[in-house]
Amino acid sequence: MTSKPSTSDGRAHSISHVPGTHMRGTSASHSPRPFRPCADCTCSPGLLSRQGRRASLFLRQLENSRRSSSMLLNELKGAGGGSSAGNGSVYSCDSLCAVNREVNTTDRLLKLRQEMKKHDLCCYIVPSCDEHQSEYVSLRDQRRAFISGFSGSAGVACITRDLLNFNDDHPDGKSILSTDGRYFNQARQELDYNWTLLRQNEDPITWQEWCVREALEMAKGLGNKEGMVLKIGIDPKLITFNDYVSFRKMIDTKYDAKGKVELVPVEENLVDSIWPDFETLPERPCNDLLLLKYEFHGEEFKDKKEKLLKKLNDKASSATTGRNTFIVVALDEICWLLNLRGSDIDYNPVFFSYVAINEDETILFTNNPFNDDISEYFKINGIEVRPYEQIWEHLTKITSQASSAEHEFLIPDSASWQMVRCLNTSTNANGAIAKKMTAQNFAIIHSPIDVLKSIKNDIEIKNAHKAQVKDAVCLVQYFAWLEQQLVGREALIDEYRAAEKLTEIRKTQRNFMGNSFETISSTGSNAAIIHYSPPVENSSMIDPTKIYLCDSGSQFLEGTTDITRTIHLTKPTKEEMDNYTLVLKGGLALERLIFPENTPGFNIDAIARQFLWSRGLDYKHGTGHGIGSFLNVHEGPMGVGFRPHLMNFPLRAGNIISNEPGYYKDGEYGIRIESDMLIKKATEKGNFLKFENMTVVPYCRKLINTKLLNEEEKTQINEYHARVWRTIVHFLQPQSISYKWLKRETSPL
């Protein structure tokens, strides 16, 4: 739906729409719709009237709570108490839908463009990642969120400075936010009027192409003066060298703009420069290190190092003698290699560090404190510790070693442009020089640790099963509690409070280290926002007459979990049941699949989508991602999805991946069913692999339309629910609400 621009609507534009129009985001608030009987089902009038009374009661109770909150707010104001939301009680019932979390970015963009002028930039790029190319970043590295207001985990912001505007105090320009299908709805809600949303894989151009086109348009407006070079700037630590080379190639070949447009490094991060003008710049976290015991990791550092060096020697050129230095950049790879964990990034047990490793030495660059036991561990294993910042000096120093005919220097394809620049300090390290270095004793490779880490050993697999059982017990207790509160007691509970309750339950489990990501607790239309997270204040009330989607996970010392269940607490519509069942059928089909070794997840993605496709439906995210072992909840390199890079990484025995098809109806509801699966040898079929569902949480019986299931699927569900019951019942008090809930949900179809 499109509408004319309005000064009262501060939402982002969509790049795919006609100039002069823009798409409005999902409404931030609306009045509850009156109950209407479903139009396409066989419900009896009695059932419908009970559902109607429950909906009406819910709305009356909500209205009473709002009225009480309003009276309390007036009392506070009258007493000079202001409008503090410290307790959240005044605001917790404010809306049935997601609140408008839009940030006004006008002043921030103005300041940024002033900084761009100092560096003679026509365009500036702000990626999501940190210098380790992390998907999830610390507050210190959330530059893209700061400048754009968009809080999703993936996306790139591009800001231009209009060179035809000569008002230095108020420079003008454009700004876009590019993100993928998981975040389209969220971006429309969070971006203000300064921003245009560029939808990856749907809009006709990429963000890189947009930057070059804008630069060329400005050059044209300035008369394409001889010798004029328009500069696109980026922090060289925040873009990989490979991406830099691809960007340069696109400028030079696709647009024939060599000498007209240039991608330049800006070592002073411009967002960091303006951040303190608006709020305190967060400090980089530097928390204590944790040394994992063998009972949790199952493989000593020396054994991992031996495997790594063998892989590196296989990748090195035949001219070297085996003394190949490799720089480990990814934080989870460092944690896995050293059997250490940290807490520098929320939900991810990692710490800021680099590692330089070869046959003779292992150097860990970190500022994180550690105890005497870890100090002794470093000494025993020959691990030298240096300050985090010294990695750049070290890279410059060992360039001379890399020039030796007997030594090859290797960096991962996740290495930053700045890393390559440090390896070649005599020049500016453009693409041509990189090729020359590569032809000598310098190479960019895919990190062998990425694959080694993804193949879990026997101890990690055993522990992963334990983690799944622990989390399943928590989720059973949580869903039983939620139903008792919302249906049994007709209480008002908002999405955020519910998520906090789930965390409280998880904290009762031994070795619980925290959540593996921010809990997605979403009711009704909020569930259609794929990566929704409830706000602390003004969170939506969970409506028991609508779908509720809960996507959550835990970090235990034993392992990492990622589980989604979609439930309905009263009477779902036939459409909701049908679409839930189509999603469920896709997940079941993928789980049953037996496939040849060396099959990439790209090749089997359609298995999970086939039943949705048959109805003209689909979902805009991958079907499965790797899961770490008390590490990142998103782990590569393999996965099941439609992204072309997944064709390069086959699924292997020992991988743990998610299985999470879904369906999302904008403005109404969302469905996702996610379980974690272990890939195993299918010995009865020769060189074939199969999946084992490790998650033991029941599906929602109310949402299953058995008429859409065949006998094989019914048997599969019944056998799964029988296993869930056998596994979990021993952890529950007999005849408790959790016990009764589990018994009902796992009863045969």
Swiss-Prot record:
Primary localisation category: cytoplasm
Pfam families: Creatinase_N, Creatinase_N_2, Peptidase_M24, Peptidase_M24_C
Binding site for Mn(2+) 2: 551, 562, 674
GO CC annotations on file: cytoplasm; cytosol
Residue positions where Phosphoserine is found in the record: 69, 92, 95
Chain residues that bind Mn(2+) 1: 562, 660, 674
Keywords: Aminopeptidase, Cytoplasm, Hydrolase, Manganese, Metal-binding, Metalloprotease, Phosphoprotein, Protease
Keyword Hydrolase: yes
Note: Present with 3237 molecules/cell in log phase SD medium.
Functional note: Involved in the regulation of the iron regulon in responss to decreased mitochondrial iron-sulfur cluster synthesis.
Protein family per UniProt: Belongs to the peptidase M24B family.
Official protein name in the record: Putative Xaa-Pro aminopeptidase FRA1
